[in-house]
């Protein structure tokens, strides 16, 4: 049985020091790779790293060192520049310290005592200014101490399997006007194999990085002259998007959704009415037109509400399903922008459903079925998280209970695995978050299904029921992909750029061996485009055959057709299928027909 390193009580994790101090009992947390255990291991590893840095750079001052999804990090400052190469030196010092088997102990101080103790450390003063408590805690190991809430391991000797992964800059407290600190990230596990597996995945993730592949494959770019976080879709990337949009549009049509479009900018008065102005203003962009303030939309919901309000509504019309590939703008700090995953302009596969309370379950059932079709088409495993009523919320108990019960029932009827985030819903209604797992077993938050009782009330939406009474509808916000930008980034990394045939930006590439085959290759390309609907390209560069094939391979085109004199004469094509890793021959007409069938057999 592995060593006990903490206690879980009322969903909170306590280390042994704190549990003993507060007299807390609960479920034991063993030294393993459980989520609770890793939270303790990685927090202690952050302190181990800080101790090593303090020994190597005595002038070092530390801000915060939390556990995050990708491990842990510490923000700090020193007088000298630290590079990637220095991480190995810091790591070696960490291993040396860990072997000293220092007990990790906790000291509780009054605010006054803590302020006196760290009076000459400006970063610790900054940390304390953010803590409202009158009692503060310090953790010590050897001659190192740091202000911290915990939880921590009982001894440094338990820290054996860790790796420092990257170095970056970070503004103090995330404030772009504050000083820049150094941030070092790391990872830690309870055993050697888990660390080895993680590092393999990390290397694989670097190869699959959508920013790298996007540039290599000519999918998208960014231009500082235009502005950070504003993606430019190149022809091949736009083709990829079009292929996804085409499939999605057909599926939406079949499921009874109507296309709508709202304006890009709306008067600030309407954002005040919706609540965005008071709750989301810092994430919005504004402009003045004719002395009137307008807000560039960060969400599509208000436009769809105005579509609903464009005429009187009856219960006979409900549910109404409106969709839009809506371009939205949200202000993100430059430090958090990351390729297509985090941008300032993006397009949502957004839909809003206006329905009666009694229709919530059937509508959610349909959305879950839609989600299943999309995820299966791309080979994604997915799970869902149901977030329930928070302490601060609007609406009466009965509506909340009915809405939450409808979401639960829909999930269970569809045999979908889900977690419950108690109290994690929006103030205006419960929600389901869609989380997908990619080929590297990383989890990504994509779409969401949100029940909204707030906006229908704010905008006084109504429909006439069967008794000729005006009733407020329920509004369901629904996005399955989340945004096209984010989803394309995830797809690129999931497939490593090897997109399946049905969405590949170039589906067929024709490589004539010489000048004599060019004319036939051009005719064949046009036939493929017009008769199969596939994107076909012609490699007509004056290069050797082997180089042409290498270029096509680098572009990760699914089907490569090499055309020589024999193929021109016989009209039987030599095909290389990169996805199936096979080579075969097919008559020209049969190839085009097969291509059309393969592309057409996928639907959402």
From Swiss-Prot:
The keyword S-adenosyl-L-methionine does not apply. Binds 1 zinc ion per subunit. It is found in: Cytoplasm. Gene3D superfamilies: 3.30.54.20, Anticodon-binding domain, Bira Bifunctional Protein, Domain 2, Threonyl-trna Synthetase, Chain A, domain 2. One of its GO terms (cellular component) is cytosol. One of its GO terms (molecular function) is tRNA binding. Its EC number is 6.1.1.3. Residues 209-500 are annotated as: Catalytic. Homodimer. Belongs to the class-II aminoacyl-tRNA synthetase family. This is Threonine--tRNA ligase. The gene is thrS.
């Amino acid at each position: 049985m592995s060593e006990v390193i903490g206690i879980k009580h009322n969903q909170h994790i306590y280390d042994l020091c704190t549990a003993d101090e507060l007299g807390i009992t609960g479920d034991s947390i063993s030294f393993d790779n459980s989520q609770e255990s890793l939270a303790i291991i990685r927090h202690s590893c952050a302190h181990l790293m800080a101790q090593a840095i303090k020994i190597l750079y005595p002038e070092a001052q530390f801000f915060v060192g939390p556990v995050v999804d990708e491990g842990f990090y510490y923000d700090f400052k020193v007088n000298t520049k630290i590079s990637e190469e220095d991480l190995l030196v810091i790591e070696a010092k960490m291993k040396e310290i860990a072997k000293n088997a220092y007990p990790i102990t906790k000291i509780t101080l009054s605010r006054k005592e803590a302020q006196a103790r760290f009076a000459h450390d400006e970063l610790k003063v900054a940390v304390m200014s953010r803590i409202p408590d009158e009692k503060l805690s310090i953790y010590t190991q050897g001659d190192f101490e740091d202000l911290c809430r915990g939880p921590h391991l009982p001894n440094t000797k338990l820290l054996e399997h860790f790796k420092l992964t990257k170095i970056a800059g970070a503004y103090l407290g995330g404030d772009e006007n504050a000083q820049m600190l150094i941030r070092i990230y790391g990872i830690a596990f309870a055993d050697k194999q888990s660390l080895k597996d993680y590092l393999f995945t990390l290397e694989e993730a670097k190869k699959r990085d959508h920013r790298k592949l996007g540039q290599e494959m000519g999918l998208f770019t960014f231009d500082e002259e235009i502005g950070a976080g504003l993606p430019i879709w190149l022809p091949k990337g736009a083709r990829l998007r079009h292929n996804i949009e085409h499939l999605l549009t057909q599926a939406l049509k079949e499921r009874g959704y109507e296309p709508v479009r709202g304006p890009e900018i709306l008067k600030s008065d309407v954002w005040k009415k919706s609540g965005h102005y008071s709750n989301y203003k810092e994430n919005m962009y504004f402009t003045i037109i004719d002395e009137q303030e307008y807000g560039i939309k960060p969400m599509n919901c208000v436009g769809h509400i105005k579509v609903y309000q464009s005429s009187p509504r009856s219960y006979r019309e409900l549910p109404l399903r409106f969709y839009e590939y809506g371009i939205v703008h949200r202000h993100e700090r430059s430090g958090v922008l990351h390729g297509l995953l985090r941008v300032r302009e993006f397009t949502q596969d957004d839909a809003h459903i206006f329905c009666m309370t009694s229709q919530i379950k059937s509508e959610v059932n349909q959305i879950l079925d839609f989600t299943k079709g999309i995820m299966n088409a791309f080979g994604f495993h997915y799970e869902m998280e149901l977030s329930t009523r928070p302490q601060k919320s609007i609406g009466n108990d009965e509506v909340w209970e009915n809405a939450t019960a409808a979401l639960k029932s829909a999930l269970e009827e569809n045999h979908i695995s889900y977690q419950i985030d108690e109290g994690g819903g929006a103030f205006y209604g419960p929600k389901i978050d869609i989380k997908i797992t990619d080929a590297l077993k990383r989890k990504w938050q994509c779409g969401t299904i949100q029940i909204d009782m707030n906006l229908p009330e704010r905008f006084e939406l109504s429909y006439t029921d069967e008794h000729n009474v005006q009733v407020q509808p329920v509004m369901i916000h629904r996005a399955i992909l989340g945004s096209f930008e984010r989803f394309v980034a995830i797809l690129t990394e999931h497939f490593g750029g090897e997109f399946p045939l049905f969405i590949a930006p170039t589906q067929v590439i024709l490589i004539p061996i010489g000048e004599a085959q060019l004319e036939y290759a051009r005719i064949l390309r046009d036939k493929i485009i017009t008769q199969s609907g596939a994107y076909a390209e012609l490699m007509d560069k004056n290069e050797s055959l082997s180089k042409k094939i290498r270029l096509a391979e680098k572009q990760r085109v699914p089907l490569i057709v090499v055309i020589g004199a024999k193929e021109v004469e016989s009209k039987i094509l030599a095909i290389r299928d990169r996805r199936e890793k096979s080579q075969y021959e097919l008559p020209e007409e049969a190839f085009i027909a097969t291509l059309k069938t393969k592309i057409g057999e996928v639907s959402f």
